[in-house]
Amino acid sequence: MKLQLVAVGTKMPDWVQTGYTEYLRRFPKDMPFELIEIPAGKRGKNADIKRILDKEGEQMLAAAGKNRIVTLNIPGKPWDTPQLANELERWKQDGRDVSLLIGGPEGLSPACKAAAEQSWSLSALTLPHPLVRVLVAESLYRAWSITTNHPYHRE
């Protein structure tokens, strides 16, 4: 199974790249974790936000292809670490690759939300999208460590 993080935004601070890459390199070869960045639409005073969201959504769904789609969204289901490990196991058994979608400043398009098989809430707080990349990578790595009895996660 391959994991994909499909995220709106291309110019992240160095600390985001450093944090994300740290967890990316730890993933096992049989579970590669790939980042696909979708350019954010131009937002200005008179921007048509609906059109921008729709275009970003189309690009995200095209990147995801036929993968299982999991959106990251505040109203999604909150999973603690053991629950995420169980989800990871279910995804592996399903046999499809998984695309996790992170929207832009206005969130995800209606098409992305409709295409999602699952919606995951990291927190009831609104988190900065660059930070979410690092949190998702660490959380999935920790979940993997539980499923393989790797010593990274401690109770």
From Swiss-Prot:
S-adenosyl-L-methionine binds at residues 72, 103, 122-127. One of its GO terms (molecular function) is rRNA (pseudouridine-N3-)-methyltransferase activity. Its EC number is 2.1.1.177. It is an enzyme of class 2 (transferase). It is found in: Cytoplasm. InterPro entries: Alpha/beta_knot_MTases, RlmH-like, tRNA_m1G_MTases_N. It catalyses: pseudouridine(1915) in 23S rRNA + S-adenosyl-L-methionine = N(3)-methylpseudouridine(1915) in 23S rRNA + S-adenosyl-L-homocysteine + H(+). Keywords: Cytoplasm, Methyltransferase, rRNA processing, S-adenosyl-L-methionine, Transferase. The keyword Cytoplasm applies. SUPFAM superfamilies: alpha/beta knot. Coiled coil: none annotated. One of its GO terms (cellular component) is cytoplasm. Homodimer. Belongs to the RNA methyltransferase RlmH family. HAMAP family: 23SrRNA_methyltr_H (MF_00658). Specifically methylates the pseudouridine at position 1915 (m3Psi1915) in 23S rRNA. This is Ribosomal RNA large subunit methyltransferase H. It comes from Salmonella choleraesuis (strain SC-B67). The gene is rlmH.
